Amino acid sequence: MSFQPKKNKKMQKKKLRIYNPKIKEECGVFGISNTKDASTLTALGLHALQHRGQEGCGIVSFDGMKYHSEKRFGLVGDNFNNEEVLSKLPGNYAIGHNRYSTTGGTTLRNVQPFYADTNAGGIAVS
């Protein structure tokens, strides 16, 4: 004799929600390391990814000693298009981010990359 639980018809009809691994186009991220003019190349990379987010953009660079950050509302081409802005981002390492808002308000503090520069070291993430 075997025991088999009764099948619930509602459960049979209910579809399971399974994680869909399909790539979603939200935000754009670009990074580069050990390269001269890293912030300029990062701005170009973000420009190529502009379709991934238009709300805001930011770049964090690292010069081997300190992190430097510039974040702006709007398009990459309107914000990181001159030497005056890019000269504020020295270093051979940089990451950039185009914001496509999925959560949080439209504030500059929600524009990435985020970074922490401490006496013990630092980190930048996007």
Placement of each model-derived feature along the sequence:
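N-terminal glutamine amidotransferase
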Residues: 2-126
